[in-house]
């Protein structure tokens, strides 16, 4: 057996570092990373033993910290959570989040730090207007004006196969980061918003359906405009807290302005001669939203009665449950290969790679620094550059 290369870390820093993560117990660390046993970690935290350099680096990676942090003599200031966990307000969730979600939030916040670092000497981005009251229509109108949004759309061809990407690009063009969270159950979260004066963050769960993501995106935009950074499930439950209810209404009004929506809905009902799931799907298609979002908007704008709303909700739910296997199969596709740059942009959005690539092009950073900032192998730079810089 070779000689162990010890990392003579500060045990106090190991304890502090774990306290900054969702790992409440030693065993929970071992569950995620079996090579770091609870027994060994306990000995390291007590100072009875030391990890090897390899083990310490693995632990630093797990905790999302620089390796050098473990050698500090004093604990750094605790990182302030920048959002309100609104999932807990209905009593269904504890305040804890999974390691997968926590890890994704760290990744997205780190990406924003990189964007800010490479743009700090440039002209400040356009300020998001502050509206100091709960006027749903005024805030929705401000969102539409800020984004230059024009709905209803002429047809589904406006957004092609993916309405979420259509709206996402509009939002990102206005320097609002839109990332997607991977590996997190949809029941745990649908959306996250973190307000900053420049480059605020929106994160959407990648496991959701594309049209459902559209509503989540605008729900989180409402939080950004209200400066009410939040972690949300966005289930439009009547028992949601007041802030969630307001943001649901703002999202609906921003995506589906009342007068335009009522006109489209009534025209469709007249053309088809009935209010059914086909009619609702066509209405939803003009705005790139889910049938459930369109149905709720029909009720909110009094196009249909409360009774008809619940009747149709039952029909749509039954149709979905009856066809869920087909829907999931169609969604997953036929094992068609997806290019690396497509996966990368799907997860991280366009702002990060565009900012880093421009920093390299202007001579601010080297090629190696560019690859490290993006977290990609050099061989992927060409395809990323083509996808981002010429879009």
What are the functions of these language-model segments?
Residues 1-391:
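Active-site hotspot residues in diverse enzymes, especially metal/ion-binding acidic/histidine motifs
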């Amino acid at each position: 057996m070779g000689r162990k290369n010890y990392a003579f870390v500060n045990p106090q820093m190991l304890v502090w570092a774990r306290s900054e993560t969702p790992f409440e117990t030693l065993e929970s660390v071992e569950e995620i990373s079996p090579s770091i046993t609870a027994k060994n970690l306990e000995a390291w935290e007590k100072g009875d033993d030391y990890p090897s350099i390899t083990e310490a680096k693995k632990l630093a990676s797990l905790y999302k910290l620089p390796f050098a942090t473990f050698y500090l003599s004093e604990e750094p200031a605790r990182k302030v959570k920048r959002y309100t966990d609104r999932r807990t307000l209905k009593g269904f969730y504890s305040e804890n989040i999974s390691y997968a979600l926590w890890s994704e939030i760290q990744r997205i916040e780190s990406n924003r730090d990189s964007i800010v670092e490479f743009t700090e000497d440039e002209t400040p981005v356009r300020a998001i207007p502050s509206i100091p009251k709960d006027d749903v229509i005024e805030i929705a109108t401000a969102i539409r004006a800020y984004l230059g949004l024009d709905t209803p759309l002429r047809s589904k061809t406006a957004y092609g196969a993916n309405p979420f990407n259509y709206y996402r690009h509009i939002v990102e063009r206005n320097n609002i980061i839109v990332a997607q969270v991977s590996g997190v159950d949809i029941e745990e979260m649908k959306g996250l918003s973190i307000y900053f004066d420049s480059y605020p963050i929106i994160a959407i769960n990648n496991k959701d359906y594309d049209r459902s993501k559209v509503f989540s995106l605008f729900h989180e935009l409402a939080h950004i405009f209200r400066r009410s950074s939040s972690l949300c499930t966005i289930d439009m439950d009547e028992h949601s807290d007041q802030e969630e209810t307001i943001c649901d209404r703002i999202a609906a009004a921003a995506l589906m302005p009342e007068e335009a929506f009522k006109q489209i809905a009534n025209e469709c009902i007249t053309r088809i001669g009935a209010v059914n799931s086909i009619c609702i799907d066509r209405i939803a298609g003009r705005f790139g939203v889910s049938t459930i979002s369109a149905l709720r908007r029909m009720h909110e704008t009094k196009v249909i009665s409360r009774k008809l709303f619940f009747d149709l909700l039952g029909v749509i739910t039954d149709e979905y449950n009856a066809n869920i296997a087909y829907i999931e199969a169609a969604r997953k596709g036929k094992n068609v290969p997806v290019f690396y740059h497509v996966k990368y942009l799907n997860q991280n959005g366009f702002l990060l790679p565009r900012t880093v690539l421009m920093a390299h092009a202007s001579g601010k950073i080297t090629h190696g620094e560019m690859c490290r900032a993006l977290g990609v192998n050099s061989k992927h730079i060409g395809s990323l550059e083509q996808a981002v810089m010429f879009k």
